[in-house]
């Protein structure tokens, strides 16, 4: 089972919070102190909380649950996509569109349009159009791919959200709360931990820290999924590789 040690976290700078003047007092229980006007996160709290979150992600994945990775800030964009793809899960790494979860019906229509445009771009339909029309459609395709490409095969609401930066992704968290979808989130010293089921106090800006969280989460999900496949193989539902 994937776990992350105190040493891993120190090396990735997980303990560096935000400047003290930007703090959210609700994060006080997770703060060790301050150094040079920057809050230091108490990793003795973070290590067990993160490892508990990994165990839970593993369980959800072993029950065939769908995990949606969310991170739209610059330091997370690439890492979120890589992590989700590495464990066959889903992601949103560009702007979170309001209603992405709470208005799933409408989102499903847009996904259908995205898939239609994808086939048109591959089956030669674009070549038969006027230059202007082809350009308009490929622009629409690009836009839809950017916002929905990571969830186009999700086939319904996710069973959990794994969020980088609770403050930045507060709309996604609120939608998940409204629908009773559990939220795992990296919560920095400037963020509000309310509404988060699995709080992971940590630096949400440093690329190394972001990669550490995502790699560990993806590994936990992969291991959970392989348990599920192993069980199915035992029951003769799938062929073991």
From Swiss-Prot:
One Pfam family matching this protein: Ribosomal_S2
Annotated TM spans: none
GO molecular-function terms, A-Z: structural constituent of ribosome
Entry's Gene Ontology cellular component terms: cytosolic small ribosomal subunit
One GO-annotated biological process of the protein: translation
Alphabetical UniProt keywords: Ribonucleoprotein, Ribosomal protein
Entries under InterPro entries matching the protein: Ribosomal_uS2, Ribosomal_uS2_bac/mit/plastid, Ribosomal_uS2_CS, Ribosomal_uS2_flav_dom_sf
Family statement drawn from the similarity comment of this UniProt entry: Belongs to the universal ribosomal protein uS2 family.
Name this protein carries in UniProt: Small ribosomal subunit protein uS2
Species for this entry: Proteus mirabilis (strain HI4320)
Name of the encoding gene: rpsB
